[in-house]
């Protein structure tokens, strides 16, 4: 099946604005995938959108709406993409493929793509967010190059999946991007290949910072998301059918006596108070200590937040209370399967696995890993990380961008 890629704002733009000679296939139609597809279309980049049959995102609605996505916020108006069921057709028609999905379901996307390895050798893939995609999957997939963003370039939320509406709250001022195989300039500095720089300039308006693939694993979302989620875990409703009849009756009585707040809960503004921010900063210290053991110098959690949005918040609590972009909607976990307890768990376990290679202890990080597993009722009796990086050696880490791997006894505080 051949597909005709379209990328038009409606009504059609002025005649002197010609489409760019670039075609993109977005794989994943959740909040960020839908928003990025519309963003690329707004920049006149022909865009196809694909998702697996069981994907909970918006692709069915987009197909029913003839490929039209309506946006509000940073860009406004309807934009048309080509929603497609045929992954092979998307691969053949796209110069660049962009995976936009949770890290804890990367396996299923990789399994789908591996069926087309013969056609991937000339393709570049961008993974948003990467979470160590190249480290984990480069041997299973035969892409020309694997690029990974350290964070999503876009902050967005599907506001009405039935009508394909998405609120694009912010475009990041900057984000990190890695390339594997690692490319270096004439001076030996890690850089993006020259033939890709114009492509990324067409796709994104942000300042792109080239980083090694290993550094992608250390991005701080696992702290800003998982820590407040765990520390507010008591807000979650009990799982369906988990209560006895008597317990259900008593819960109803409690709700009648003191009804739960009708208004929503602002995850950042209300869920990350000063005490929670203190915990985040301590776990951030552990994160940066492990990165330093690999020769990677990371900015603090607060500095990363300010760099992303080009802001000057003085404290992490101030950042969490800012009206936009994180307190626009009541976006908060409602069960233990939410990505803050799943995707970010993968990242915490990856950092812990690297720490084990460097023989560094992470008491707080391990505590949060164990609490998430315990909350899911799946505590690992061996205490061993499920991260594939647990099987790596120091030389493996160096292959993906570590300059060295110090043992903790060699490190100077």
Curated annotation (Swiss-Prot):
Keywords: Crown gall tumor, NADP, Oxidoreductase, Plasmid
Gene Ontology terms for molecular function: D-nopaline dehydrogenase activity; NAD binding; oxidoreductase activity, acting on the CH-OH group of donors, NAD or NADP as acceptor
Native source organism of the sequence: Agrobacterium tumefaciens (strain T37)
EC number: 1.5.1.19
Keyword NADP: yes
Full protein name: D-nopaline dehydrogenase
Swiss-Prot/TrEMBL GO biological process terms: glycerol-3-phosphate catabolic process
Entry's family note: Belongs to the lysopine/nopaline/octopine/opine/vitopine dehydrogenases family.
Oligomeric and partner information: Homotetramer.
Lineage of origin: Bacteria, Pseudomonadati, Pseudomonadota, Alphaproteobacteria, Hyphomicrobiales
Name of the encoding gene: nos
Catalyses which reaction(s): D-nopaline + NADP(+) + H2O = L-arginine + 2-oxoglutarate + NADPH + H(+)
Keyword Oxidoreductase: yes
EC top class, as a word: oxidoreductase
